[in-house]
């Protein structure tokens, strides 16, 4: 897909920078140079998708395949709502500016990046496929891909997202003996899976204390914790007791809390569990710390986006706070003021799959073009 994006940028007459992040994964940066003297604006979007479409539960759904089709004014296909539709809007916004002969003072760039999806390497899950959480944008900003401001076209229902939560991933483990079933009589309570039952009950007691803590709230939204996975034993060899069982949590952290503080707090909880169940061999590991991001309501980018949205839709856009992660996490830490603003997340259709309304894409592209004029200034 990166190759297709590069070809598109070349056809548009953009200055193109190919960033080979690793084998099989690249960022593509297209730059429309300005006349000088104006702020620069980046449109950032990720090339990777949440799914491949080959998953058994998706393989039969046409809208989750990498083959587009149009039906009833809606465009279907893998990744259209998250967020390949936004990438198309960026391209058409710059094409519209070129067709209209609009020259801007500041540079406008489109950054098509890899490795944004919320996933990471852990255990046997190793390799490029599992390197996410802004891996591409982290490479981008350290290799020349910087601007004064950035619009991220994540699916926000055309709302201006002034901030989003970060994510902390935690592993909690229990241990037990590894013995043959025949010799396990009287030792069921030592089984690491059985021991994890105590831990899970205690974690479920702890979760509301995290979610209800005012310190963990942001912009009217509460924090949230997902009990995401449990791994223990060997399905191919259940003649042995499991020597270790792992529980995995996704703990959402407000952008106002330092990740080091969040890490300290969740590990204190784990230490409490170890003290409560000393025979369980409990240990904890924090293996993702992806901070949230925010932008001030009075930042010039918000004013520029408000004006553009109002011109297209006839009303000021609503505000929102989300608990999903975006590459704003990295961009803001490089001094790039970043806001999430994009299309609908799509009409939920479990039969036909991922989709977006074409008219909505056209209007969003116009908002982006007008926002670029407002930010970068017409020469």
Spans of features found by a protein language model:
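Acidic/histidine-rich catalytic neighborhood of metal-dependent amide-processing enzymes
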Residues: 83-165
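Acidic-glycine-rich active-site phosphate/pyrophosphate-binding loop
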Residues: 54-71, 163-174, 304-308, 339
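Active-site metal-coordination/substrate-binding segment of hydrolases
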Residues: 38-112, 118-120, 352
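N-terminal helical capping/dimerization or prosegment-like subdomains
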Residues: 1-59, 244-248, 262-268
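Short beta-strand segments
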Residues: 44-46, 111-113, 151-154, 173, ...
């Amino acid at each position: 897909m990166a190759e297709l994006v590069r070809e598109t940028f070349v056809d548009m007459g953009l200055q193109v920078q190919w960033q080979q992040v690793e084998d099989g994964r690249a960022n593509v940066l297209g730059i429309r140079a300005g006349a000088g003297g104006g702020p620069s604006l980046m449109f950032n979007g990720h090339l990777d998708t949440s799914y491949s479409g080959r998953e058994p539960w998706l393989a039969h759904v046409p809208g989750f395949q990498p083959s587009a089709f149009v039906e009833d004014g809606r465009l279907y296909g893998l990744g259209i709502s998250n967020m390949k539709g936004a990438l198309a809007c960026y391209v058409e916004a710059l094409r519209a500016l070129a067709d209209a002969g609009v020259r801007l003072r500041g540079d406008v760039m489109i950054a098509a990046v890899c490795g944004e999806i919320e996933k990471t390497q852990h255990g046997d899950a190793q390799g490029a496929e599992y390197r996410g959480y802004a891996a591409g944008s982290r490479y981008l900003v350290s290799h020349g891909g910087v601007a004064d401001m950035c619009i991220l076209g994540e699916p926000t229902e055309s709302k201006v997202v002034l901030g989003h939560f970060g994510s902390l991933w935690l592993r909690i483990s229990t241990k037990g003996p590894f013995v043959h079933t025949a010799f396990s009589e009287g030792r069921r309570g030592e089984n690491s899976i059985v021991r994890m039952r105590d831990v899970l009950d205690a974690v479920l007691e702890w979760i509301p204390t995290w979610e209800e803590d005012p310190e963990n709230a942001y912009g009217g939204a509460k924090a949230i914790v997902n009990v995401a996975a449990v791994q223990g034993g060997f399905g191919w060899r259940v003649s042995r007791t499991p020597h270790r069982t792992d529980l995995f949590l996704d703990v959402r952290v407000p952008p106002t809390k330092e990740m080091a503080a969040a890490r300290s707090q969740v590990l204190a909880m784990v230490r409490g569990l170890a003290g409560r169940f000393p025979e369980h061999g409990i240990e904890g590991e924090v293996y993702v710390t992806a901070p949230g991001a925010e932008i001030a309501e009075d930042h010039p980018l918000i004013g520029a986006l408000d004006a553009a949205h109002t011109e297209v839709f006839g009303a000021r856009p609503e505000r929102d706070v989300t608990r999903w992660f975006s590459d704003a996490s990295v961009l803001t830490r490089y001094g790039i003021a970043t806001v999430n603003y994009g299309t609908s997340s799509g009409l939920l259709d479990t039969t036909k799959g991922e989709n977006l309304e074409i008219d909505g894409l056209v209007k969003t592209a116009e908002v982006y073009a007008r926002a670029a004029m407002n930010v970068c200034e017409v020469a």
